[in-house]
Amino acid sequence: MSESNSIAPAPAPAPVADENEALARSVILIVDDNAQNVELLQAYLEALPCRIVTAFDGIQAMKYIDDPDQAKPDLILLDVMMPKMSGFEVCQKIKEDPATRSIPIMMVTALNELGDIERGVEAGTDDFLTKPVNKLELITRVKSLLRVRHLKRELDRTMAYIEDIENRAQKNEPGGPVG
């Protein structure tokens, strides 16, 4: 094949970052109406290189999430029993919106009945942790949810890359595979 007919490969997606690098880019939103609970969760998560942002009710949380000038959180730690808007309502709103539905939500609450857990799952929560919170359990679950979040992002980027290559190959455009 002559040089003028060769097709240059499309640039590959960026390599997968290591876990600490991914954690350092992560934003965790803590939503709880009790300032002491917020401070405790912040103190527990200090060991992680994440950026922590807070909201003290569901309406404040939704304003942060919907603000185009703010980075979307990579994880939300959400209390259930709050004034103005319950955690169940916040969770449901987030999961109904295509722009935010992939954000993992961990409900962190004093509610511990099976019906409460079921209601959380029905609202769309990804995890459910009862208070009082164990620091090691919290950190382990947070790392796990963030790992899944970042792997999904990598998968989405790779799938977009593959789709781009397939589209270029079908149109015989530069950047598609040589064949």
Where are these regions (language model features)?
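Receiver (REC) domain active-site loop signature in two-component systems and cognate sites
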Residues: 82
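Active-site residues of response regulator receiver
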Residues: 79, 109
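Non-catalytic signal-transmission and effector/linker regions of two-component phosphorelay proteins
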Residues: 1-29, 42, 70, 153, ...
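Acidic, metal-coordinating helix/loop segments flanking the phosphotransfer/catalytic sites
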Residues: 54-75
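C-terminal output helix
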Residues: 133-142, 146, 150
